[in-house]
């Protein structure tokens, strides 16, 4: 049997409001529905998926800091509005040396000007933006493929 892969999914501020917050941009599914769907997919891929959501920057930083001791091999992060403001989350991701994908439900590059800059994209393994909730599944499948290729 293959070794189990540990992936952490982090969702940032206001993503707890998915389903009711601007459904024309973010869709009608709740964060719980999105996470449940990706957790089902993770089982099929032999992945243990841990999920975490916070509106507090320092809690996200602490969660990232703990990734090494928790044997996390890959991070999927939708930083929400912290994408455009948080150097501390960027620094935390850079410090731990664990690959990550930055995920956005909407296409941040096709929205307001202030949303088009990401403090994390240049250190991310990749950015998945504008695919709606399906972006989470793309990120999960691609992270697994990345880790399996890295093992070869």
Curated annotation (Swiss-Prot):
Q: Which residues form the active site?
A: 26 (proton acceptor), 104 (proton donor)
- What are the entry keywords? Amino-acid biosynthesis, Aromatic amino acid biosynthesis, Lyase
Biological process per Gene Ontology, one example term: amino acid biosynthetic process
Q: In which pathway does it act?
A: Metabolic intermediate biosynthesis; chorismate biosynthesis; chorismate from D-erythrose 4-phosphate and phosphoenolpyruvate: step 3/7
Provide the E.C. number(s) assigned to this enzyme: 4.2.1.10
Q: Which GO terms describe its molecular function?
A: 3-dehydroquinate dehydratase activity
Lyase recorded as keyword: yes
Sequence positions that bind substrate: 78, 84, 91, 105-106, 115
One protein family per Pfam = DHquinase_II
Annotated site residues (Transition state stabilizer) in this chain:
21
Matching entries from Gene3D superfamilies are given as: Dehydroquinase, class II (3.40.50.9100)
Q: Which domain of life is it from?
A: Bacteria
**Catalytically driven reaction(s):** 3-dehydroquinate = 3-dehydroshikimate + H2O
Amino-acid biosynthesis among keywords: yes
What family does the entry list?
Belongs to the type-II 3-dehydroquinase family.
**Self-association state and partner proteins as the record states:** Homododecamer.
What is this protein's function?
Catalyzes a trans-dehydration via an enolate intermediate.
- Designated name of the protein: 3-dehydroquinate dehydratase
């Amino acid at each position: 049997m293959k070794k189990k892969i540990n992936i952490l999914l982090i969702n940032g501020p206001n993503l707890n409001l998915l389903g009711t917050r601007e459904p024309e941009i973010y869709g009608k599914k709740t964060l719980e529905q999105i996470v449940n769907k990706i957790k089902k997919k993770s089982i099929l891929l032999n992945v243990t998926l841990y999920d975490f959501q916070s509106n507090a920057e320092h809690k996200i930083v602490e969660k990232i800091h703990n990734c090494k001791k928790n044997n996390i091999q890959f991070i999927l992060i939708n930083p929400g509005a912290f994408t455009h403001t948080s150097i501390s989350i960027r620094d935390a991701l850079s410090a731990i040396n664990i690959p990550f994908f930055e995920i956005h439900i909407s296409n941040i590059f096709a929205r307001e000007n202030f949303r088009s800059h990401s403090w994390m994209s240049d250190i991310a393994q990749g950015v998945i933006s504008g695919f709606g909730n399906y972006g989470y599944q793309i990120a999960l499948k691609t992270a697994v493929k990345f880790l399996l290729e890295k093992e070869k």
